[in-house]
A protein has these predicted regions:
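Extended alpha-helical targeting/anchoring segments
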Residues: 1-249
Length: 249
């Protein structure tokens, strides 16, 4: 809806741990956002793409920030399983991500695309009725299926023939404040490829681009006002054995 543009900015509690002189600003105006959204819808109607993850940037200047403290508070609030923090040469990343991009253990690969979100009304219990409502939502379900198919196709490029499976389609999981719909794609990677080959075939995560991925990224590059930087990227670890686990930023 037209109110979506300002909804984030109006959530003052999100920024209560920051001391900001000039407020939070958007890189684009509301009219520019709506105009671009309309153009992207036309791409979908013409059959150029099925969906695009269209984003815009909020920014602040002259802020007084204790990044480690902010990360601690946000992580305590969200309890996200793939949170990440670093502070290197004055560049800070504060990430409370719920989504896994790609994990490798020995020859096994797993990716867990996340599409489909609904507010969680009760934090104490897992409400099966709420979960069913999310899973039966045709928009959320179809988005998840499309991105899962994209991820399956990406992984198949570096996987042993016949090894790619969708282990779970559109499972609903409770997180703090929301339910998320997650699918799980598994495969056996080919023996003669490197970790760089694997990431090159699968990056960036389809849930952050759209489908088909290449065309979605072209449209993102055309309509988004600023480069995403590390946003939509990945943070994780590689161990000495060559295994890794990466999130979606």
């Amino acid at each position: 809806s037209e109110d979506d543009f300002n909804s984030i900015l109006n959530q003052k509690n999100v920024f209560k741990y920051l001391k900001i002189s000039n407020g939070i600003n958007s890189r684009i105006t509301k009219s520019e956002y709506l105009n671009n959204a309309s153009k992207i819808k036309n791409h979908i109607l013409r059959g150029d793409i099925y969906e695009v993850n269209y984003c815009f940037e909020y920014y602040a200047e002259d802020i007084n920030l204790n990044s480690a403290n902010l990360f601690y508070k946000l992580n305590k609030l969200t309890k996200s399983p793939f949170s990440a923090y670093f502070n290197i040469d004055g560049i800070n990343l504060i990430c409370t991500s719920p989504e896994r991009f790609l994990k490798k253990i020995n020859n096994d690969l797993i990716s867990q695309p996340m599409k489909g979100t609904m507010e969680r009304k009760s934090m104490k219990t897992f409400d099966m009725q709420e979960a069913k409502i999310l899973k039966k939502n045709p928009k959320e379900f179809s988005e998840n299926v499309m991105i899962t198919d994209l991820v399956r196709n990406d992984i198949s490029r570096i996987a042993e023939k016949g090894s790619v499976i969708v282990d779970e389609q559109c499972g609903v999981y409770p997180f703090n404040h929301v339910y998320q719909m997650i699918s799980t794609v598994k495969a056996k990677c080919k023996r003669d490829i490197t970790n760089l080959d694997i990431i090159d075939a699968c990056f960036p995560m389809g849930s952050m681009t759209g489908a088909p991925k290449q065309r979605a990224m072209e449209i993102i590059n055309k309509y988004e006002a600023s480069q995403r930087g590390i946003y939509s990227g990945a943070v994780g670890y590689f161990n000495p054995n060559g295994d890794f686990d990466l999130n979606v930023v």
